[in-house]
């Protein structure tokens, strides 16, 4: 297939591609800036098929770098800028990264790399850009924590991104007024998928560095944007500061990261806010199941139906299985995990759910014990492994606690030795865990509830802690 950005420039060069900090740039202007940047990367030795890590944020430079690496045919490992130096080091080693490109702000998180300021000073060398893309090639790698606690690198091909964009547009439609407001991280699939859709559809991305509900509300009222991707905590913050509906041009508030509550759905209905609930994951290159507004109140708690190219079914044990061209071919350098994730061509989500008589999907447990905090996936086992390394901890169990701002935050229950010192434990956590993974509360208990086979019952802890 023709290189997407080059094709888009030929189709609609003067249409707006990016709006950042009030400045609009066309696809032609973005393409020229990307080509200049690709030349600098090329001068620094970056070539096709090399694994290049990118540690940036939601800004113009990171946006351009993502495109530039694709133009060169490099594979981009997207690093979460909230991770610790130790967590990042694991991903760099596991992915066998050739080079790291890092925003100046985050230089202390990587041992060595090309900083944005160094890149700016690099001389241009005419790059070898890819005219066409083999859709089976790997475009991006994103690490997702597994229940073992060790992150796995999800392989995302150009085909995955293409079919995700096609599936979405077949469901949501496309108009000449469309533009997508991106206040979710572009190092996450939720943000990267917006960038891919922008080029494939020919629509602008309104990129925001942070989620500021006041500023986002102004944009939603301005008529400039038609679509925004949010997680539950973002939506709830928007609803708190805004009493009415948004501009008529806003036609999709795409919600991921768990279904909305009945209260939220009723507020959206009363205010004529077009909420579209969805279910997806890093492994499905964004949403793969969606619930349109017309079904929202009739199907409270449902994630909807599989998008046109995808299929969903429930295994005998209740696990949600998915099939479709947007699903990852597997995990990087991890044949065992890849094989364990597929059964007869169906991807095993690890989530438990059911389909009602009309084929609507209901997710009962979000990967059983997964904590979703402000859109970030937190696995209790990863935190438990870190806390368990402290010699004064006999046993530990981590659960999610409801939180007004983040949706959910981790809480640790610990069976401790007499020598236990909470300050020491906090230091261990700060060294080994991203800030959002550090337990917001530590509760000392005499024993943890267990099954007959000795497995810790987190559900019992949740029940006890909620009383």
Curated annotation (Swiss-Prot):
Molecular function GO labels: ATP binding; o-succinylbenzoate-CoA ligase activity
Entry keyword annotation includes ATP-binding: yes
Catalytic reactions on record: 2-succinylbenzoate + ATP + CoA = 2-succinylbenzoyl-CoA + AMP + diphosphate
EC identifiers of the protein: 6.2.1.26
Domain of life, source organism: Bacteria
SUPFAM superfamilies per record: Acetyl-CoA synthetase-like (SSF56801)
Keyword ATP-binding: yes
GO BP: any one term: menaquinone biosynthetic process
Cited PROSITE patterns: AMP_BINDING (PS00455)
Pathway annotation from the record: Quinol/quinone metabolism; 1,4-dihydroxy-2-naphthoate biosynthesis; 1,4-dihydroxy-2-naphthoate from chorismate: step 5/7; Quinol/quinone metabolism; menaquinone biosynthesis
Keywords: ATP-binding, Ligase, Menaquinone biosynthesis, Nucleotide-binding
Pfam families: AMP-binding, AMP-binding_C
Family the UniProt entry places it in: Belongs to the ATP-dependent AMP-binding enzyme family. MenE subfamily.
Function of the molecule: Converts 2-succinylbenzoate (OSB) to 2-succinylbenzoyl-CoA (OSB-CoA).
Record-given protein name: 2-succinylbenzoate--CoA ligase
Source organism of the structure: Listeria monocytogenes serovar 1/2a (strain ATCC BAA-679 / EGD-e)
């Amino acid at each position: 297939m023709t290189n997407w950005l080059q094709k888009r420039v030929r189709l609609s060069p003067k249409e707006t591609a990016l709006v950042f900090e009030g400045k609009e740039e066309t696809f032609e202007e973005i393409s020229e800036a990307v080509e200049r940047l690709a030349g600098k990367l090329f001068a620094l030795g970056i070539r096709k098929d090399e694994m290049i890590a990118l540690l940036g944020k939601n800004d113009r430079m990171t946006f351009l770098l993502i495109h530039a690496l694709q133009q060169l045919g490099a594979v981009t490992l997207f690093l979460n800028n909230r991770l610790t130096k130790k967590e990042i080091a694991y991903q760099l080693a596991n992915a066998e990264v050739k080079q790291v490109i890092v925003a100046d702000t985050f230089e202390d998180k990587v041992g060595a790399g090309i900083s944005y300021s160094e890149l700016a000073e690099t001389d241009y060398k005419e790059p070898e850009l890819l005219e066409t893309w083999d859709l089976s090639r790997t475009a991006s790698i994103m690490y997702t924590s597994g229940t073992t606690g060790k992150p796995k690198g999800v392989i995302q091909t150009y085909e995955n991104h293409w079919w995700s964009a096609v599936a979405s547009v077949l469901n949501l439609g496309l108009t000449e007024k469309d533009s997508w407001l991106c206040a979710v991280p572009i190092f996450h699939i939720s943000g990267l998928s917006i960038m891919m859709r922008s080029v494939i559809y020919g629509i602008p991305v309104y990129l925001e560095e942070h989620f500021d509900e006041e500023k986002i509300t102004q944009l939603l009222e301005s008529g400039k944007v038609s679509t925004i991707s949010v997680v539950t905590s973002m939506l709830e913050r928007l609803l708190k500061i805004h009493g009415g509906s948004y501009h008529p041009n806003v036609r999709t508030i795409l919600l991921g990261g768990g279904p909305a509550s009945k209260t939220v759905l009723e507020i959206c209905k009363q205010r004529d806010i077009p909420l579209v609930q969805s279910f997806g994951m890093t492994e499905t290159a964004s949403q793969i199941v969606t619930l349109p507004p017309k079904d929202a109140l009739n199907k409270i708690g449902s994630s909807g139906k599989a998008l046109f190219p995808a299929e969903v079914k429930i295994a005998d044990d209740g696990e949600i299985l998915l099939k479709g061209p947007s699903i990852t071919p597997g995990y990087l350098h991890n044949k065992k995990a890849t094989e364990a994730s597929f059964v007869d061509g169906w991807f095993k989500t690890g989530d438990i759910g059911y389909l009602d008589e009309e084929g609507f999907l209901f997710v009962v447990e979000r990967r059983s014990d997964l904590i979703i905090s402000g859109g970030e996936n937190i696995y209790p086992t990863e935190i438990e492994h870190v806390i368990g390394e402290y010699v004064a901890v006999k046993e530990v169990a981590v659960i999610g606690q409801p939180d007004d701002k983040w949706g959910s935050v981790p809480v640790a229950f610990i069976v401790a030795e007499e020598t236990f010192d909470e300050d020491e434990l906090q230091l261990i956590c700060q060294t080994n865990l991203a800030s959002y993974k550090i337990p917001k509360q530590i509760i000392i208990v005499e024993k943890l509830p267990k099954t007959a086979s000795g497995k810790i019952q987190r559900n019992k802890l949740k029940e006890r802690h909620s009383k």
